[in-house]
Amino acid sequence: MSTLLLNLDFGEPPPKKALEGNAKHRNFVKKRRLLERRGFLSKKNQPPSKAPKLHSEPSKKGETPTVDGTWKTPSFPKKKTAASSNGSGQPLDKKAAVSWLTPAPSKKADSVAAKVDLLGEFQSALPKINSHPTRSQKKSSQKKSSKKNHPQKNAPQNSTQAHSENKCSGASQKLPRKMVAIDCEMVGTGPKGHVSSLARCSIVNYNGDVLYDEYILPPCHIVDYRTRWSGIRKQHMVNATPFKIARGQILKILTGKIVVGHAIHNDFKALQYFHPKSLTRDTSHIPPLNRKADCPENATMSLKHLTKKLLNRDIQVGKSGHSSVEDAQATMELYKLVEVEWEEHLARNPPTD
């Protein structure tokens, strides 16, 4: 980088006032005075009155450095000189007055660098003012304010709209979402074994996972184990849970939930329990399920037939008897085929308990 040349003349200048610099410097001074009048530039933040010397300038003989990085020249007897733009009182001609602003005109790159340095000095002298936001910043701030001040577009605007949306989303949302399926196996008690008593109970959740599966000892003597259908044998009753204890455990699971079953009234009768009709789903009396199986709507179809027709699966086969876990899982899968349609029907025609 080439050094700047300073042409100094210590002779007597002409009596007329020295020029204040080129057009760019005059424009700079004009803007600085405007900022001073408006209060943006205080005296404390004004650039130094003396023309700053570049760091590349060597110190002259007799000069001493000061705190602000300039070099102090010893004072000499004052002479009558014309007022210069830097107010130093030294006789400077036009070239000397603007030498720190105008670099050597030999190279264009040096001129651009000098202008950048000048702009940096001017900006550093200005007080810190909040800069105006750009377009992108304005847009982002407007979006943030709109999100805070206005409700979301997807949110319902009033209670009527919210009610209509909830109605369209399905009646199943208004009912308890916890749903279980139950199946019970009975044995014969009483005279000639005509009384059906609970001997095994299985409960599965919505996904078919087993929540409860226990053998239950009836309070009365077992006359007929009905092994061909129930799968219950004498050895199953050795460590079976007493009916009273098992009933309390089962009702604790069923309370407050939607209970699905096939011919479920028989299971509730064996449990000596009444479940609300609004929370009961009996797959033996669901017309849409019969329609899917190409059966008469009002006919009572067996669980085995519906499972084979709709799930393409065989259950209750062999001579070992039924599995209450398998039957409960099949019942839940059948109900899930018509769940949305049947829940909407029940919402329009709620059953009375």
Curated annotation (Swiss-Prot):
Keywords from the named record: Exonuclease, Hydrolase, Nuclease, Nucleus, Ribosome biogenesis
Sequence ranges assigned to domain Exonuclease in this UniProt record: 178-353
Top EC class of this enzyme: hydrolase
Presence of the UniProt keyword Hydrolase in the record: yes
UniProt xrefs under SMART domains: EXOIII
Single GO molecular function: 3'-5'-RNA exonuclease activity
Recorded superkingdom: Eukaryota
Biased composition (Polar residues): 152-172
Main location: nucleus
Localization per Swiss-Prot or TrEMBL: Nucleus, Nucleolus
InterPro entries: Exonuclease_RNaseT/DNA_pol3, ISG20_DEDDh, REXO1/3/4-like, RNaseH-like_sf, RNaseH_sf
Biased composition (Basic and acidic residues): 14-23, 54-63
Segments for region (Disordered): 1-93, 125-172
A cellular-component GO term for this protein: nucleolus
EC number: 3.1.-.-
Biased composition (Basic residues): 24-35, 135-151
Signal peptide from the UniProt entry: none
Gene Ontology biological process: ribosome biogenesis; RNA processing
Functional summary from the UniProt entry: 3'-> 5'-exoribonuclease involved in ribosome biogenesis in the processing of the 12S pre-rRNA. Displays a strong specificity for a 3'-end containing a free hydroxyl group.
Protein name as annotated: Interferon-stimulated 20 kDa exonuclease-like 2
Provenance organism: Homo sapiens (Human)
Gene transcribed to yield this protein: ISG20L2
